[in-house]
Amino acid sequence: MKTSLQIAAEAHLEPIGVIAERLGLPTEYLEPYGRYRGKIDLTFLDDHANRPRGRYILVSAITPTPLGEGKTTTAIGLAMALNRIGKRAVVTLRQSSLGPVFGIKGGGAGGGYSQIVPLAESILHLNGDIHAVSQAHNQLAALTDNSWYHGNPLDIDPDRIEIRRVVDVNDRFLRQVMIGLGGKQNGFPRQTGFDISVASELMAILAMVSGAGAKAALRELRARIGRMVVAFRRDGTPVTAEDVRGAGAATVLMREALKPNLMQTIENTPALIHAGPFANIAQGNSSILADLVALRCAEYTITEAGFGADIGAEKFFNLKCRAGGLWPDAAVIVATVRALKAHSGKYEIVAGKPLPVALLQENPDDVFAGGDNLRRQIANITQFGVPVVVALNTYPEDTATEIEAVAQIATAAGAVGMAVSNVYAAGGAGGVELAKLVARVTERPGPREPKYLYPLEMPLAEKIEVIARRIYGAAGIELSATAAAQLATLTEAGFGNLPICMVKTHLSLSHDPKLRGAPAGFIFPIREVRISAGAGFILPIAGTTVTMPGLGAHPAAHQVDIDDDGNIVGLF
C-alpha cells in the first residue's frame, strides 16, 4: 500500500469555499488562508444562534499501545462514511504539534485513505495557531521575569515562578536550564525549563473558550488569560497574568487563533481543526468553539478525545461538555485485536520496534484475556448515560475468530453493537457499517441530559477519588503530604468548586504504565496538585509528568526531506 503522504499527494482537493458550502457555512464567514485552508469568523455563532444543533458523536478508544489504535483515522473515516450514506457530517480534531510529527508518534491527521488534506499543511504550522500560543506564552514568561527584575513590585518569589518558556519541538535538553547568566544586565540567574508549546495553559484555554459569539469569545479569552497563575508571592498568594500586565498583549497575539480552522478530508468532507492540548497533562480535546460551529452547520459532528476513554473521554464529559453546554448522542470506542492481545499481558509493544511475531498469529483466547480493558472502557462511557458503539479497526492479520471475540466482548459489556472498520485502506467505504450503526443509535429524538461524574461543589479530594474509583478501578487514593496541603490551600483560596483534570499515564487505566488490562484494587497516588486557573481546572498529578518530550534514537525527522520540485518526502 502507498504511504499516507503519497496517497495525500494524489488526492483531489476542492477549493476551501466549496468545502464551506458543503459544511453549510455561508461564505461570508469564511476567511481563506490560501486555496485549501481557511478560518471561520465567529460572528457566525452570533448570527445563527437559533439554528438547531445536529447530532454529536464522541470517538474514544481502549487504553492504547504506544503505536496508537487509529482513533483519529476512525473519526475521519466515520465522518466520510456518514456522508456516503446521505448524512451531512463534519469531523472536529485537535491541531498537530510539530514535536510528535518529527518525533515518533506521528501527526494526528489520520492516515491512509482516511486523512486530512493537504497533509503537510495540516500538520506543519496549519494557520499559525501554535505559533500564536507560543508567542503569547513566552511574552507572559518574559513579563513575569521582567517584573521580578525591575524592583519586584509584586514581591514574586523567584523560586516559585511557575511559568516556563515553550517551544514546539521535542527536546529533552531544554527540560532543565539556567537563565539570567552573564551578569545583572542579563537578569538574575535561576533554574527553569522549557515545555512543548501545546503543554501551555494558553492552549488549554483556547480549547475551553465557549463564548456564544465573536465578542463573547474574545472577552472570555481575555478573562481566562488574566486568571492564569504565573508565579507566587513570598507570602504564598498567586501572581496572575493580569498582575504582570500581560493578559492584554497575550490576547492580542491569540485573537486570530481563536477562530477555528477549516480543512477537508481526502474525500472532501469538511474538517474543523482547532486547539491541541495533550490529554495526559491537560483536557485532550479540540475546541468547544469548533464544535459549536460544527453543530450549527452539520447533521453529524464527529469529535475525537485523546488517548483512552479513561483520560480523553472522562475529560470530554466533565470538562469540555460542562464548560460548553454540550452532550453527545453516542460514543464510539475504537479497539484493535493487537491492542486487546497486548492487554492480556503476554506481549510487549515498543514504539519504533517491530511487533512481536506471536502477536500477529491467530489467538482469540488472548483477545478474551485482554478484553477486560474494553469492558472497563465501555463501562466508563455508559455510566455517563451515553450509548456506546465499538469500532474494530482491523488489520490484514486479524482473523474471523478474533473479530468475533471482540464482538462478543463488546455486546456482553453493554455496547449497542460492534462494527468492523477498514477506513485506513478503503476510506469512507470501509466505514459504512459503522456509520449505519451510529446513525441508528442516534435516531432517538431530543437531546440527552448531562450526567456528570461529580457535582462541582463536592470537595476536591472527593472529586479526585470519584474519578479514581469509578473510572480507573482504584480502591482509593493516597495524597502525599504536599498534595494534601496544596488541596487545602486551593480550597481556602476559593478554587474548591473547579473540576478535576487528572494528570497520569495514558498507557494504563492505573497510574502505572506497566499495568495492562483492567487493574483493580490498587491505591491511586497523588504526588502533587497544580492549578490551571485560566483553563478552569485543578490538576492532580500521579507519577512523573513530562511536559517536554524527547527524541528517540531514530526520530521521524531523519526520514523527512524535499525533492527538486519542492515535494515533501518521508513525512509519513
UniProtKB/Swiss-Prot annotation:
Entry's EC annotation: 6.3.4.3
GO molecular function, one term: formate-tetrahydrofolate ligase activity
Catalytic activity annotation: (6S)-5,6,7,8-tetrahydrofolate + formate + ATP = (6R)-10-formyltetrahydrofolate + ADP + phosphate
GO biological process, one term: tetrahydrofolate interconversion
Any Pfam family the entry gives: FTHFS
Residues that hold ATP according to the record: 65-72
Record-linked NCBIfam families: PRK13505.1
Family named by the database record: Belongs to the formate--tetrahydrofolate ligase family.
Protein name according to UniProt: Formate--tetrahydrofolate ligase
Naturally occurring in which organism (per UniProt): Chloroflexus aggregans (strain MD-66 / DSM 9485)
Organism taxonomic ancestry: Bacteria, Bacillati, Chloroflexota, Chloroflexia, Chloroflexales
Gene name for this UniProt entry: fhs
